[in-house]
Amino acid sequence: MKNIGININTDKDISRNILDKIFQYIHEECSEAKIKVFYDSKGLDNEESRALDAVMVLGGDGTILGTARALAKYDVPIFGINRGHLGFLAEIELEDCKKAIKNLFKGQYKIEDRIMLKCDLKGIDKKDDFLALNDIVLTKGNLSRIVKYSIYVDDVWYTTFVADGVIVATPTGSTAYSLSAGGPIVYPDLDVLEIAPICPHSLGIRPILLNGNSKINIRVLKKYEDPVLTIDGQRYKKVTVNEVTISKSEYKCRLIKFKDKDYFKILRTKISYRSRECEGE
């Protein structure tokens, strides 16, 4: 492992001193290592990134999401040094950075392949790659009016309801927006997709888990303005068509996970149960 990328979120508190220390830690483990620095994911999606052995992300979970989308086509593994708020995906804290880099070069890690989503807009030429690691969300526009949606799974009608929107999430995204919409926490290596309605106007409409190979069609039956498509909470596009198709992408996000990290501990402390009675012994 000699070609290392570092993707920096310039909105975070990352001083030159921090970066110099990271350079030092890397060269202590491999004096011949070549390091390429990226800022705010610019240039990460270029073909040259295919040569990288790993990318370290200095930022928060949002920076991880952007990095994952940029590198998805190149099969480059990533891990995050948390400089954000939550740090669920970017799970390495700054004080543990040296240890993580040492373990990286010693090969003391595993790689988790995480499902990603793709989205096609019916009747529109594919000019953009709508890839998502967390979720793809179709919602009403700015008006405070609900929209009527009809959901088809593998071309079979599932249900129709009125709601503020619809979330289609991966297992990775199950701890994000869909969790707030009442969806379950899904273990990250499961091959499933989740549909979670946002504020449905019916008590009987609940989130559902589907086979990961399912094709999900969302048809907008009644609208007062063009709905909005949001990718990982970061990319935003007004939708002028009445049907959106969401399915599993052929690309995956490759997350580097170090052996001393426990998913359930991270879940307890950062997502699920922030109370003394659940801290354990």
UniProtKB/Swiss-Prot annotation:
Top-level taxon in the UniProt lineage: Bacteria
Subcellular location: Cytoplasm
One cellular-component annotation, GO: cytoplasm
Binding site for NAD(+): 61-62, 134-135, 145, 164, 175-180, 234
Task of the protein: Involved in the regulation of the intracellular balance of NAD and NADP, and is a key enzyme in the biosynthesis of NADP. Catalyzes specifically the phosphorylation on 2'-hydroxyl of the adenosine moiety of NAD to yield NADP.
Organism encoding this protein: Clostridium botulinum (strain ATCC 19397 / Type A)
InterPro entries, sorted: ATP-NAD_kinase_N, ATP-NAD_kinase_PpnK-typ_C, NAD/diacylglycerol_kinase_sf, NADK
Active site residues of this protein: 61
EC number from the UniProt entry: 2.7.1.23
Protein name from the UniProt record: NAD kinase
Family note: Belongs to the NAD kinase family.
GN (gene name): nadK
Cofactor(s) it depends on: a divalent metal cation
Keyword terms of this UniProt record: ATP-binding, Cytoplasm, Kinase, NAD, NADP, Nucleotide-binding, Transferase
Recorded catalytic activity of this chain's protein: NAD(+) + ATP = ADP + NADP(+) + H(+)
Top EC group: transferase
Gene Ontology molecular function: ATP binding; metal ion binding; NAD binding; NAD+ kinase activity
GO biological process: NAD metabolic process; NADP biosynthetic process
